């Protein structure tokens, strides 16, 4: 099994169309090179709970959910992808830095376990509704 952590659309630029193409190209290359199943062991992006936007802007709940949808489209197109593990279940504390004010916000739930929009999208995916 080939296991990869990838953050297209977050650490590697915010253009979701480019993220989708870059992710797919890379996963196809891994599949072609090794001929083994692929498990995406980490993927996602931060969202500040309650930060909403009519357009999908980085740090909003909409962007986080749309970013996950981008990854899921790629996973669903590629037979080589046999599993996925979104990063992360819930927001958590980290050392402060210019990219992490009050912790890591990649959780699909807040630190006190309130669901963000991404949690609802994942629920729909796992139930087969979306």
Give residue spans per PLM region:
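Substrate-binding/catalytic cleft of secreted carbohydrate-active enzymes
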Residues: 1-122
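Surface beta-strand/loop "capping" patches
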Residues: 124-130
